[in-house]
Structures are given as structure tokens and as C-alpha cells.
UniProtKB/Swiss-Prot annotation:
ATP binds at G26, P27, E28, S29, S30, G31, K32, T33. One of its GO terms (cellular component) is cytosol. It comes from Neisseria elongata subsp. glycolytica. It comes from the Bacteria. Can catalyze the hydrolysis of ATP in the presence of single-stranded DNA, the ATP-dependent uptake of single-stranded DNA by duplex DNA, and the ATP-dependent hybridization of homologous single-stranded DNAs. It interacts with LexA causing its activation and leading to its autocatalytic cleavage. GO terms for biological process: DNA recombination; DNA repair; SOS response. CDD domains: RecA. Disulfide bonds: none annotated. It is found in: Cytoplasm. Belongs to the RecA family. Pfam families: RecA. InterPro entries: AAA+_ATPase (IPR003593), DNA_recomb/repair_RecA (IPR013765), DNA_recomb/repair_RecA_CS (IPR020584), P-loop_NTPase (IPR027417), RecA-like_N (IPR049428), RecA_ATP-bd (IPR020588), RecA_monomer-monomer_interface (IPR020587). Keywords: ATP-binding, Cytoplasm, DNA damage, DNA recombination, DNA repair, DNA-binding, Nucleotide-binding, SOS response. This is Protein RecA.
Length: 237
């Protein structure tokens, strides 16, 4: 379960599918990490073991705890390079002892050559190559051990696009291809209590779904310091 009733319904299988790769993408502070932490909390409630690969070095245990995550039981890794992050992910998946792995985020998976190189060096296509190699390897292991792997991704703007959407996700096309489910998450209107902003309306579109019909949508409220508002969703449903 994702912690959101509406999104679980939109996904068609009651939540994120196991043994699959899922991509959650959207603009900054749209609720991507919150949604992942909610899913981790639900997984842990059902006795699952979860891991969080924090490539962005932005994991906040206090916030995670507020969302119901058992931080003591969560495996958190802060790798130095993209290669290391994906190796750790592969190792966790192959072990068969983990139910869910979250990678936050694809944009922060910087190849070793780029980290060790100089600022002005050109590293065109390195990250895309790294992703496609890693995903080719990962897919088989994920299927065998029935692990859920979630990649959080950011949105970038393509330059000079005249027609169609100028938005694209980072890390090349491999993830689009290998992901069984792709979620596009957007922040909507602010939720106010008097003059104070207490949260945001959030819209999630299921852009790709290989396990149920795609293109369904869900809307829910994310309240600051609390996460997805269950009560609001029950009233809406």
C-alpha cells in the first residue's frame, strides 16, 4: 500500500507491485519522498524489511518517524557514487532479505568518473549508460526475489522543444523502459487553516502501468509533518 486509498485504487492492484521497478517523478517538493516513506511505513506494518538508499544525503529520520516509519528497522545507506548506490541496491535485492528498496534519487546517482574528474570535464551520457547497465542486471534479480524497487526521479526541461511537453526525467530512457509503474506526482493548491499553510493538495497520475490499466489519477492531501491525510480521502471516497 502507498498509504493513500485513492492511489492504491488508481494503481489497480491495491498498491505498488512487488517484483517490479517503480519510478516516481515530479518537480521539487511535490511529495515524492513523502509518498515513498508512507509506502515504507505500510510495508513495515505488514512485517516487511525496507531499505532507503539516500544518494541525495537528505534523509530526515525525524520526519520519517512522523510518517510512521520505524527508523530503527530501516536500512539507510548514503553512498558516495552512483555505481556504489546501484551495487548496494543489487546486493540488497539479491540477498532476498529485503521487501522494498527506495533510491532517492536518480539525479543524484553521479558516476564515479564525474566525481573524480574536474569541474569543466564533459561527461555526456555517462549517467544514462550507468542506469541502463544497472537496470539490465537488476531486473532479473528483482523478479527472482520478488522485491519492490522504487526510483525517485526529478524533472528537467528539454531546451528548444517546440511541440509536445518539454519535460523529461533524468538518467536516460532505460528507467522509462524497465519500470512497470511510473507515477507523475504534482503539487496542487495550498491547504490553509486560517492564515497558516498546513499542507498541499497532491495529484498523482499513473503514466505507465504494466500490471493494471494505466492513466488513472488520484488526488489527496499531504499535510506538513503528518503525510497523506487519511480522513480527507475517506470523506472524498
Amino acid at each position: 500500500s502507498t498509504g493513500s486509498l485513492g492511489l492504491d485504487l488508481a494503481l489497480g492492484v491495491g498498491g505498488l507491485p512487488r517484483g517490479r521497478i517503480v519510478e516516481i517523478f515530479g518537480p521539487e517538493s511535490s511529495g515524492k519522498t513523502t509518498l515513498c516513506l508512507e509506502t515504507i511505513a505500510q510495508c513495515q506494518k505488514n512485517g516487511g524489511v525496507c531499505a532507503f538508499i539516500d544518494a541525495e544525503n537528505a534523509f530526515d529520520p525525524i520526519y520519517a518517524r512522523k510518517l510512521g516509519v520505524k527508523v530503527e528497522e530501516l536500512m539507510v545507506s548514503q553512498p558516495d557514487t552512483g555505481e556504489q548506490a546501484l551495487e548496494i541496491c543489487d546486493m540488497l535485492v539479491r540477498s532476498g532479505g529485503v521487501d522494498m528498496v527506495v533510491i532517492d534519487s536518480v539525479a543524484a546517482l553521479v558516476p564515479k568518473a564525474e566525481i573524480e574528474g574536474d569541474m569543466g570535464d564533459s561527461h555526456v551520457g555517462l549517467q544514462a549508460r550507468l542506469m541502463s547497465q544497472a537496470l539490465r542486471k537488476l531486473t532479473g534479480h528483482i523478479k527472482k526475489t520478488n522485491t519492490l524497487v522504487v526510483f525517485i526521479n526529478q524533472i528537467r526541461m528539454k531546451i528548444g522543444v517546440m511541440f509536445g511537453s518539454p519535460e523529461t526525467t533524468t538518467g536516460g530512457n532505460a528507467l522509462k523502459f524497465y519500470a512497470s509503474v511510473r507515477l507523475d506526482i504534482r503539487r496542487g493548491l495550498q491547504i490553509k487553516k486560517g492564515d497558516d499553510v498546513i499542507g498541499n493538495e497532491t495529484k498523482v497520475k499513473v503514466i505507465k502501468n504494466k500490471v493494471a490499466p494505466p492513466f488513472r489519477q488520484a488526488e489527496f492531501d499531504i499535510l506538513y509533518g503528518e503525510g497523506v491525510s487519511w480522513e480527507g480521502e475517506l470523506i472524498d471516497l
